[in-house]
Structures are given as C-alpha cells and as structure tokens.
Amino acid sequence: KRLLQNLGIEINQVIPEGGFVEDLQNLPKAWFNFVPYREIGLMTAVYLEKEFGMPYVSITPMGIVDTAECIRQIQKHINELAVVSLEETVDYEPYIYQQTKFV
C-alpha cells in the first residue's frame, strides 16, 4: 500500500482485506490490478484481464531491481490508459532514482 500511496495512486480495493462481496462490483473501476505475490491473486488478475481488459502487474516489489521494474510496469499501464482517457501521463523515474541513489 505504501508504495502505491508514495506514487500518488488511489487504491480502489484490497482483496480480501476487509472486503465484502458487494465490493467486488467495484473491481472493474480500477485502471490495473496489482498482484504483489504471484501465489495469491494471479488467477483472479488473469481472469479480470481476460474478461474486462484490465492489465495487471505481478512483479513483487522486493529489492532494488524488482521494485524499479514493478514501478515501471505500473507507469506503463497508467500511461497507456492516460492516453486513451486524455489524462496526464506519469513519470516515476525521479522516484526510482531518489529511492535508489544511496544504495
């Protein structure tokens, strides 16, 4: 959650954390799905991509390389949708640089 919040991304749902069955109807409102642990939720993300065209990111943000790649995948999906919906694109490279420059 903290990574997404640091990037300024509003979280639609965290499933199954505190969720109700009624909340599932809001899943298609998300721009993409984030599956930080492939063992949990990947099949659901694949289904949502197939049924609703919702892309997903399934890279676990652990370690410098994977965290940077995860953020770049998030950026890619947001920017693809931003072009279609005439929203602003995002550039998370400064964030990645800031988080890794002293490592």
Curated annotation (Swiss-Prot):
Its EC number is 1.3.7.7. GO terms for biological process: light-independent chlorophyll biosynthetic process; photosynthesis. Binds 1 [4Fe-4S] cluster per heterodimer. The cluster is bound at the heterodimer interface by residues from both subunits. Its cofactor is [4Fe-4S] cluster. SUPFAM superfamilies: Helical backbone' metal receptor (SSF53807). GO terms for cellular component: chloroplast. Pathway: Porphyrin-containing compound metabolism; chlorophyll biosynthesis (light-independent). Pfam families: Oxidored_nitro. Keywords: 4Fe-4S, ATP-binding, Chlorophyll biosynthesis, Chloroplast, Iron, Iron-sulfur, Metal-binding, Nucleotide-binding, Oxidoreductase, Photosynthesis, Plastid. Belongs to the ChlB/BchB/BchZ family. Component of the dark-operative protochlorophyllide reductase (DPOR) that uses Mg-ATP and reduced ferredoxin to reduce ring D of protochlorophyllide (Pchlide) to form chlorophyllide a (Chlide). This reaction is light-independent. The NB-protein (ChlN-ChlB) is the catalytic component of the complex. This is Light-independent protochlorophyllide reductase subunit B. The gene is chlB.
